[in-house]
Each structure stands twice: as structure tokens, then as C-alpha cells.
Amino acid sequence: MATKAAFAKMNGLGNQIIVADMRGRADRITPEAAIRLAGDSETAFDQIMAIHDPRTAGTDNYIAIINCDGTEAQACGNGTRCVVQALAAETGRQAFTFETRAGILTATEHEDGLISVDMGKPRFDWQDIPLAEEFRDTRMIELQVGPIDAPVLHSPSVASMGNPHAIFWVDRDVWSYELEKFGPLLEHHPIFPERANISIAHVTSPETIDLRTWERGAGLTRACGSAACAAAVSAVRTRRTGRTVTVNVPGGPLRIEWRDDDHVMMTGPAEWEFSGTFDPATGEWSRDAQNDKPTDRGAA
């Protein structure tokens, strides 16, 4: 019988994260285990960030990302910040390089506790997002919610931050739209062969965007880092904002900078909640009796 793995329950602006220590192990977290953990009120999560041994020279770890429905994700900016906080507390280091399904990510913890993640370069070609049919201009595509002559939402910007995003621009409060109603329908729309993250965005100034997101494989979320990045770069492409903005998500603000080298930097906090151990095959878990913070004795 395999030994249990250590984990830390954390969050990035309310985006619920489990950071699981799978280093030195040959097994993987099963979809069944993920679904069981997601169904428990104490361990309910949006994503599991499973830290594995590195696969590629020059990286510190491979990070497998698992949604609460048991599917795998390519990217999770909020989860990456949680991983950095956990590993920084364990190792005393501030800078890390990770490999994910989306590619190589670098991240740094600052003296003020905020964490910056280089989310890489956005992609806008319809085949890279991907879309099921050709669109030469992905700043706006033909897609709408509601009646043809009076759509509730229409003409989203689409982009990939290693995962597909659709951003619907609106001119009033993002909370006035029933994202919980149409989010799952749009996530599974045929135009998105790999499904998509669906966001509503309201530009409130040249430096600020309000954003709500229906996250692919997770549902409504208080924060989605890659969606904030996708909204920021799409706002620049549609001439709504400058290249550095604050994206206000339900959980709080994220600072997004689309640099001149085309890389997107995301900066925000991470928060530790509790630690424990779990069975990667079944999802059976227990809370650590001591339950110290990672700054006291290391994390996941």
C-alpha cells in the first residue's frame, strides 16, 4: 500500500488550491481521489497543484494541475503562486522555475509576500487557442448569448494563456450577468473543441478591469489568474487599456503587465489554510494534528 502524500490547503484570492507533494513518488493522483477531495467541505478545491520531480533540465519541478472534476488543466496562475509560497517557506528560496502542460513558468516571491508569475506569451491564432473553425481576427469572434436581435453577450475576444479563454466585454457591473447560467453552456460550446474558460469583463478605467470567470472544469471561481491575464492582453488588443492594469476579481486585485518582450507577468498574494496527508489513489485524507503554518515547519 502506497504511503500517503503531504498536502497544504491554500488559496489565491479565494481560488481554492490544494498543493500536493508528489516528489519522489511514482504514483499519480487519480481522478477518483480528486473528485472525493473536491466533494469534502474542508478540502473542496478549484485546482490541485501536484508537485512532482523535474522532468526537464533547468526546472525545479513538474507541476500537474487537476481540476475539481478530475480533469487535467494546462495552467493555473493562482495555484502557481500557492506553490511558490509553499516551496519558498520550505527552502528559503525566492525564485523558481516550473514545467507544466502549458510550458515553462518562472515565479518569484517578493519581500512583501506578493508573488509574481511569468505566465509566458499569449497566443491569438485560432488554431492555437484552439477554435473549431477559422477566425482571422480573434479580437472579436462571432458568438453570442440570447436573442439574435438583442443578445445579452456577444463578440468575445479569445486568447490562449496555455489554456483557452473567451472574454465578453460589457458596459455595466459584471455581477448583473447570470454567469452561473450561461457559463457552463459556453464552456462546452462547439466552437471550443477543448472547452474554454468564460469571463465577463468591464473596463472601469484605462488601468482597471472588473472580471468574473466561469472556470473550465471548476465552475464559478473567486479568482482565475490565467483569465485575468487573457483579459488584460485582450483589453490591449482592443484598445481598451494600457499594458499594465489591475484586474479586480471577486477575491481581490491582481496586477497584470504585458511586457514589451510579449511575456505576461501576474502579481498577487497566496494564503495558507491548513496541512494534512491524503491517499493519491482514493482521496482519503486527514488533517495534521500540529497544523502549523508552513513558515513554521515547511509546506507540502
Curated annotation (Swiss-Prot):
Keywords, sorted A to Z: Amino-acid biosynthesis, Cytoplasm, Isomerase, Lysine biosynthesis
Active-site annotation: 76 (proton donor), 224 (proton acceptor)
Disulphide bond pairs: none
Segments for region (Disordered): 275-300
Keyword Amino-acid biosynthesis: yes
Annotated compartments: Cytoplasm
GO-annotated cellular components: cytosol
Pathway given in the UniProt record: Amino-acid biosynthesis; L-lysine biosynthesis via DAP pathway; DL-2,6-diaminopimelate from LL-2,6-diaminopimelate: step 1/1
Binding site for substrate: 15, 47, 67, 77-78, 163, 197, 215-216, 225-226
Record's compositionally biased regions (Basic and acidic residues): 285-300
This enzyme's EC code(s): 5.1.1.7
Site residues by UniProt (Could be important to modulate the pK values of the two catalytic cysteine residues): 165, 215
Gene3D superfamilies per record: Diaminopimelate Epimerase, Chain A, domain 1
GO biological process per UniProt: lysine biosynthetic process via diaminopimelate
The family this protein is said to belong to: Belongs to the diaminopimelate epimerase family.
Matching PANTHER family: DIAMINOPIMELATE EPIMERASE, DIAMINOPIMELATE EPIMERASE, CHLOROPLASTIC
Protein name per Swiss-Prot or TrEMBL: Diaminopimelate epimerase
